[in-house]
């Protein structure tokens, strides 16, 4: 499981940072990629990665500001031109209005897609659990921005315990099909009468990962709730230390406020995202250094960077 950042800038693209988009790569878990936001130029960034567009099965939009959605029509259209690849349907989750934006863009441009898009729109009254599969659950909660904006909490369900092969061998269980039966929870009786209780040879379930991905927001309690015990918290850092007033006026957060959220939530790792173009390389190190005085395990991400979860 990895996150690859396709756009880490704020508001408008710069030479170093594209506008908002990241890919949650779940290839080992479910052979899918989930996209979070799709700012202008997202498909160009994808061309610089190993991501195959048809593997993108779900797109989660945080809000309808242009730097988070203007890349959708282009990506959806280009996804239709994947030669020699099976066309797969796509799901888009986002605030009310995302369906109208996408369909209007496709209609006006005369674009026809050989796959279906299934839209899941929500508003303030229909948040909470928005998706549940056999391996993942996704929650959405409203943040505090200048327009309706949400954050997402992606929870991997507990993983099966591992089989203790050495212990089984010591108990006289021959390697082969019996191992598979025990792994599936089946109790056995060996030829010599030895009873094998599957539970004695399988470790306890391992907790799944928790990934919190926030849209644009002021510091708010919703951010903390979404990030409780998160393995990774992706939080915007449009402004730096001392800019709390201007950040609030524009519906954004500082690096220090993001660090405070991480502390209050008990998150394990903080990734600062949505970085303003006014921060030069030397200022980026200061963003991290200042935030680390509050929350030590912090990192400022950059475009195309891949982070293992």
Swiss-Prot record:
Recorded catalytic activity of this chain's protein: Endonucleolytic cleavage of RNA, removing extra 3' nucleotides from tRNA precursor, generating 3' termini of tRNAs. A 3'-hydroxy group is left at the tRNA terminus and a 5'-phosphoryl group is left at the trailer molecule
One GO MF term attached to the UniProt entry: 3'-tRNA processing endoribonuclease activity
Gene3D superfamilies documented for this protein: Ribonuclease Z/Hydroxyacylglutathione hydrolase-like (3.60.15.10)
Highest rank taxon of the organism: Bacteria
SUPFAM superfamilies: Metallo-hydrolase/oxidoreductase
Residues at which Zn(2+) 2 binds: 67-68, 216, 274
Residues annotated as catalytic: 67
Free-text remark on how the cofactor is bound: Binds 2 Zn(2+) ions.
Entry EC number(s): 3.1.26.11
CDD domains, A to Z: RNaseZ_ZiPD-like_MBL-fold
Cofactor: Zn(2+)
UniProt keyword annotations, A-Z: Endonuclease, Hydrolase, Metal-binding, Nuclease, tRNA processing, Zinc
Binding, Zn(2+) 1: 63, 65, 145, 216
Pfam families: Lactamase_B
Function of the molecule: Zinc phosphodiesterase, which displays some tRNA 3'-processing endonuclease activity. Probably involved in tRNA maturation, by removing a 3'-trailer from precursor tRNA.
Complexes and interactors: Homodimer.
PANTHER family named in the record: ZINC PHOSPHODIESTERASE ELAC PROTEIN 1 (PTHR46018:SF2)
Annotated family: Belongs to the RNase Z family.
Protein name: Ribonuclease Z
Organism taxonomic ancestry: Bacteria, Bacillati, Bacillota, Bacilli, Lactobacillales
